[in-house]
Design a protein with these regions (language model features):
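Hydrophobic residues in beta-strands and at strand termini
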Residues: 17, 83, 128-130
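HotDog/MaoC-like acyl-thioester-processing domains
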Residues: 1-11, 87-131
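Catalytic strand-loop segment that frames the active site of acyl-thioester-processing enzymes
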Residues: 1-52
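A broadly tuned preference for mixed-charge, low-complexity surface segments
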Residues: 34-37, 62-67, 113
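Hydrophobic beta-strand-centered segment that forms part of the acyl-chain substrate-binding groove
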Residues: 44-99
Length: 131
């Protein structure tokens, strides 16, 4: 058990996805939208480059919450997020958060995922059960 008291910060995580991650994620998820895997297409539709899949970043938020329970994904009972911005390959994503509720072995975290000042996911809440 890591963070378990109201106001306590979680360990969080930092990840820098390589330029091939969107291709691997597309293969795993079946989401081959060209804004994720074709740089020329992404630029044609007004993006600066390809963007990461939002659900990939959501997965990082889930991983950060589960890490607080020793890395056991079964401890994550509920996850809710707001997608607020785009994220890009080859730029570090940092997931941070803190405990907002604690009741015995049940803890709720407030989390964000950001690339620098760009909040990619905010107002995320995760319920984790340590029991």
């Amino acid at each position: 058990v890591s963070a378990s008291s109201k106001g306590e910060k979680i360990a969080g995580l930092k990840v820098t996805p390589d330029k091939f991650l969107p291709h691997r994620y597309a293969g795993a998820s079946g989401d081959f939208n060209p804004i994720h895997i074709d740089n020329d297409f992404a630029k044609m539709v007004g993006l600066p480059s390809t963007i990461l899949h939002g659900l990939y970043v959501m997965g990082l938020v889930a991983k950060a919450a589960a890490q607080e329970a020793g890395g056991d994904p079964r401890a994550l009972k509920r996850l809710s997020v707001q997608f607020r911005g785009m994220s890009f390959p080859e730029q570090e994503i940092e997931v941070t958060g803190e405990v907002i509720e604690a009741d015995g072995t049940d803890v709720t975290f407030d989390l964000i995922a950001a690339q620098g000042e760009n909040l990619v996911i905010r107002n995320a809440t995760a319920d984790v059960s340590y029991g």
